[in-house]
């Protein structure tokens, strides 16, 4: 392997991956290739050493096993962001919140509800990242993908991505790697429609209305901080992958059954395929409150948000998985509803 083969990308041996993830767990990589440009990223993907490599960017939505033998990792660190005629183009390794800030600095609305989400721009289309009533599928114009099977890279449209709730064709694909993403934003400086009740109330706006996008960003960040969902090194509640489970979509019959079994209202929202339930409510009402299982546990639920599985400073992946499995199984036993992990699990399963 030569520098020319990798277009100058840095190669390191025996690198601990835990510090490169927001959950701060994971194995030691035998080889870490850091690509700081799209040229280097493509070269690494085409090189023999990179053909089966694990792709790692912001590390905010992945759970890596404690031990993975003979592991080569390509770290996506190309980070250029450009703006032209209301189109924001972000290289895959660009910090996501930097993309949001850049859009706002150019007077463009549409991404502000997604403020404060950790990770990289390239990860956002993979699972159609969303929060507070918005998702990237609302604004993505096209995505540049590298196909590891053919060695080609092409721009594809949202129709090719088959976006759904926290999913896309990329989520379960090993061969497609995001190189760049383009977002078509509101040149009039309007925010995205404020569909999320808590956010609309914070801004004193009717649901579905709009507001100044900078004010929306400020409100979103305040809400996220209150839930431990903005990265903060001293705050162990932020050592997580955010929400560990997606909000389940159930049939109308299952929703009615659940409502009849519990006291009080069941938080729910209309969904194209049924009724969406609040996973956090299910977790807490199955007996797993904030901070479960207690102060001495290496992995515990956030003290601010029961849907986040957190590392209290010395957890292993095995600890994290064991807690997530306990919560998932408890919700299934209590309510007959299966929770699905939101992060990508690599080398480990629930």
From Swiss-Prot:
Pathways per UniProt: Cell wall biogenesis; peptidoglycan biosynthesis
GO MF terms held by the record: FAD binding; UDP-N-acetylmuramate dehydrogenase activity
Keyword Nucleotide-binding: no
GO terms under cellular component: cytosol
EC supergroup of this enzyme: oxidoreductase
Subcellular location: Cytoplasm
Chief location of this protein within or outside the cell: cytoplasm
Entry's EC annotation: 1.3.1.98
All copies of domain FAD-binding PCMH-type, residue ranges: 25-194
Catalytic site positions: 166, 243 (proton donor), 342
Pfam families found in the cross-reference section: FAD_binding_4, MurB_C
GO annotation terms (biological process): cell division; cell wall organization; peptidoglycan biosynthetic process; regulation of cell shape
Gene3D superfamilies (alphabetical): 3.30.465.10, UDP-N-acetylenolpyruvoylglucosamine reductase, C-terminal domain (3.90.78.10), Uridine Diphospho-n-acetylenolpyruvylglucosamine Reductase, domain 2 (3.30.43.10)
Keywords, comma-separated and alphabetical: Cell cycle, Cell division, Cell shape, Cell wall biogenesis/degradation, Cytoplasm, FAD, Flavoprotein, NADP, Oxidoreductase, Peptidoglycan synthesis
Parts forming coiled coils: none
HAMAP family xrefs: MurB
Function: Cell wall formation.
Family in the record: Belongs to the MurB family.
Protein name, as recorded: UDP-N-acetylenolpyruvoylglucosamine reductase
